[in-house]
Amino acid sequence: MKEELSIDIIGLAGAYSYALDCIEAELVNIKNKHGKRVAYISICMAEYWKIQGDELQDLAMCALLHDNALTQYISEELKKDSVINCKKDLSKKKTNLHCIYGEKNITKIPFKTDVSNVILYHHEHADGTGPFQKKWNEIPLFARIIHLADTIDIIGNNTGSGNNSWNFICQYLLKNMDGLFDSECVNAFFHAFTHSESFICLRDNSFEMKLWEIIPRQKQVFDWKTCKNVADFFAKIVDYKSSFTSRHSIGVAEKAAFFAQYIGYDSINVQKIYLAGALHDIGKMAVGNEILEKPDKLTDDEFSKMKNHAGYTYLILSEVNDFEEIRDWAAFHHEKLNGKGYPFGKTAAELNEPERIMACIDIYQALTEDRPYKKGLSHEKTCEILDDMAQKGFVDSDISKKIRECFGGI
């Protein structure tokens, strides 16, 4: 496929940083917008070195996604731990593992400059006492900047607001200069934030407008391979959230794209539907695992919270510029033709073909995939269920029939 798709990639990274914040809030009580605050502190510090253009945008991208492997780390290393044990492990052990995973994941993002080892070393200490025992002169500048920004935001989160918080941060930086942080980065921070008033925007959330003023939201043009890599990167973050759906987003993306090709969609729309499939469950990042992985039937209140995930998908993807079409394809996957779906209760007249496809493919993937608590159903049995849903007015009967044809020989 040679046709290319334009995407607001920095906006998509910003949207996903919110989803990552939901995980960190669940585990270590960090307030929302942590990723964006780290990005803002980082780009303000960057002025000290006169970093501009593509380098500045790539620094912001790395900062927004610095904890991109958090769900993967928890899933692979702490599978059976309680939240309390997760907190303990996240703060004291194996910090390097999420850095290793994150560094590998980030290679799928099309950066314009070299960001090698930025995510890998973003928890290193200037004096060599960090996870990889690298000293400040062995650590990429962007990693050093993000490490300080990340630490300062966590400290600020735990010390409240106002002059007391600012004074504590100043004392902490000076105390740990040449230990946790190199003097150059400490100087860069004080160059950017000269007094408590200059730091206050991080507490009243006015910083976000300033962040997007400094970092332009320019769309990038991606070929199919790059688009798929970007989609897979974000889908992986979502799928690692729960062991119950470990390949669900990727599976939906692959089947939706395959089906779209089968019924004659052009390459641009195949790419769009792949991306929508990869992103459709991003809202589940805002739903606790005690609900996502509950072995018993959900209570009415729990089911209501579970249903919120589709609304969160809509809300999160609304942050991305010129993304309304893909957002809707992704977020409406639980809508039903008879108006009994969610989050908006759309009716048949309000649901276009790609949105109907996503609803059917999501059901097909969920029923056919293996999960810890069940074996996946056969193609035939799944199609019988889809046909029954079509007869009852839930899903599109033509799409249900074509799914039977499309996947029957696989």
Task: Locate each region found by the language model.
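Histidine- and acidic-residue-rich, metal-dependent catalytic cores
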Residues: 2-410
